[in-house]
């Protein structure tokens, strides 16, 4: 079900289409930029500091992304387009644009596949989703997201430096989407690294039928 890869790397989701994939298709970003949407791993916390218990021996988090720059992992260069609303992207492209929506059902299994390009020891993956009634005309902020992740998939080995060979990035993994969701939502997926202060951020636009 969850297939680990021997060498652990920087990376991006290649299936299904993320916001990064769409930006690459539109010629706004290169794959290498989507591979490096990394920011502090303690999100949704606001500040840098130790990774929460029981994994305090992991490298401490650098500052997590600021509101409005969450989906790009805090990047404010060309990768800021990942944070754009439909209106902002329409202005950027000089044509009408809506982020493409992946059709899903509440409670279904949502599978992702990664392509990794630089080695890291993996603590795990964290999934977050927008609140009911969130405003698509505003950039994603902490206030737009549910307060707690709807799923976390962490390796439990401690300390990481004694188990690095076991804590492998997963090329394929999956999550059960929350029940009770309807309509348009944004999902944030974080690949959390044990031996740096960062996580790698990926975002998906979903339409719950």
Report residues per predicted region:
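Short beta-strand elements
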Residues: 199-209
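Internal, hydrophobic beta-strand segments that form the core of beta-sheet-rich folds
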Residues: 126-130, 178-196
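N-terminal "mature-chain" segments and other terminal, solvent-exposed stretches
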Residues: 1-138
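Short coil/turn motifs at beta-sheet boundaries
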Residues: 105-107, 168, 182
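Exoplasmic/lumenal beta-rich domain surfaces
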Residues: 132-172
């Amino acid at each position: 079900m969850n297939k680990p890869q021997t060498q652990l790397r920087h990376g991006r989701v290649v299936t299904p289409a993320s916001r990064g994939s769409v930006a690459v298709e539109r010629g706004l970003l290169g794959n290498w930029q989507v591979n490096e949407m990394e920011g502090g791993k303690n999100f949704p916390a606001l500040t840098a500091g130790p990774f929460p218990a029981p994994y305090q021996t992991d490298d401490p988090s650098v500052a997590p992304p600021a509101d409005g720059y969450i989906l790009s992992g805090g990047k404010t260069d060309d990768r800021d387009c990942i944070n754009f609303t439909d209106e902002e992207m329409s202005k950027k492209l000089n044509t009408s644009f809506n982020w493409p929506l992946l059709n899903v059902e509440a409670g279904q299994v949502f599978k992702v596949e990664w392509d990794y390009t630089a080695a890291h020891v993996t603590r795990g993956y964290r999934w977050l989703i927008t609140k009911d009634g969130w405003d698509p005309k505003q950039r994603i902020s902490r206030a737009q997201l549910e307060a707690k992740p709807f799923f976390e998939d962490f390796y439990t080995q401690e300390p990481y430096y004694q188990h690095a060979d076991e804590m492998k990035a997963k090329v394929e993994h999956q999550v059960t989407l929350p029940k009770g969701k309807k309509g348009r939502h944004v999902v944030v997926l974080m690949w959390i690294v044990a031996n740096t202060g960062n996580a790698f951020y990926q975002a998906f636009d979903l339409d719950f039928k």
